[in-house]
Amino acid sequence: MTNSLFRQSFLSDTLNMQQSVEAKATTLSNGVRLQLHQRGVLEVIPANNSAETKNIILSSGIHGDETAPMELIDKIVHDIETGFQDVQARCLFIIAHPEATNAHTRFIEENLNRLFDEKEHQPSKELVIADQLKLLVKAFFDNTPVESRWHLDLHCAIRASKHYSFAISPKTRHPTRSKALVDFVNHSHVEALLLSNSPSSTFSWFSAEYYSAQALTMELGRVARIGENDLSRFTALDLTMRDLIAEVTPEHLPKPAITYRVSRTIVRLHQDFDFRFDDQVENFTSFMHGEVFGHDGDKPLMAKNDNEAIVFPNRNVAIGQRAALMVCEIKARFEDDQLVYD
């Protein structure tokens, strides 16, 4: 076996802020090339890299305390190094925010996953990371066929959810909801797929909007510390990611995800803002049409559709930020290889 790029592992070395990380590379006996660009950023290039090769970003740690994705990525990288994992796709593995991970917190100064638009933002540690990640994505996707580009941004939810795992497809100007992407979701046994209805400022949206990548934000269970995640809950996802990297068709059966559309985004407008439920409410909790579930100033917040459900409720966001998504279950179909709904 070729000498490892890592003293311990990709994840351990990334989190060890006491040791420096230098850019370096190695070629495995099977011809696969590993390039460590910087702390937490590893590029893997297959021996037979060509115009037909997929170019896949697998990112984790955008929120520092969401550790299950980091552990999944670390195991895949280890198996690539040993030769156990076949590599036919060019991959960029990212563990984004080790300082926040070591502090067991989502972020240090600013929510990193709201910094990938082109708006002016206040200086912060996270803004520096976002700018670096934008450059890395550009370099990775430059001179690659549009149809080869994928980005799976892996997260965990803060709260419990009626769907243990779910994926969010960002809204872009481009055809970024291909049948291949939906097939990936279904083979991963991800329980729900949310179709966003407006642009956002997330990492996956950035790749989809600016590089037409087939991109998802994937929410995998709940936040836990490294070593405390039950990775067996994500066996199907792990297998499907590995099959994607090997460019083979999964052998296990798919489980179709329930599809939702985002019906609206609740943005906090007033200091006097609250929900009528406590912080233990689950993602995808639904309401009857007309049911009041909170207020913003003197305006009641109420369900505008039967069984309209709430996702990512956060009563503590700053004024002007998203306080929740409201979603409705839909029947979707494919037109010209793209997932659409009426």
From Swiss-Prot:
Keywords attached to this entry: Arginine metabolism, Hydrolase, Metal-binding, Zinc
Family: Belongs to the AspA/AstE family. Succinylglutamate desuccinylase subfamily.
Name of the protein this chain belongs to: Succinylglutamate desuccinylase
Key word Ribosomal protein present: no
Protein species of origin: Vibrio vulnificus (strain YJ016)
Catalytic activity line of the entry: N-succinyl-L-glutamate + H2O = L-glutamate + succinate
Named cofactor requirement(s): Zn(2+)
Annotated catalytic residues: E219
Binding note for cofactor: Binds 1 zinc ion per subunit.
Positions of Zn(2+) binding: H63, E66, H155
Any GO BP: arginine catabolic process to succinate
InterPro entries hit by this protein: AspA/AstE_fam, AstE_AspA_cat, Aste_AspA_hybrid_dom, SuccinylGlu_desuccinylase
Pathway terms, separated by semicolons: Amino-acid degradation; L-arginine degradation via AST pathway; L-glutamate and succinate from L-arginine: step 5/5
This protein's encoding gene: astE
CDD domains (alphabetical): M14_ASTE
EC number: 3.5.1.96
Transmembrane regions: none
GO molecular-function terms, A-Z: hydrolase activity, acting on ester bonds; succinylglutamate desuccinylase activity; zinc ion binding
Organism taxonomic ancestry: Bacteria, Pseudomonadati, Pseudomonadota, Gammaproteobacteria, Vibrionales
Function: Transforms N(2)-succinylglutamate into succinate and glutamate.
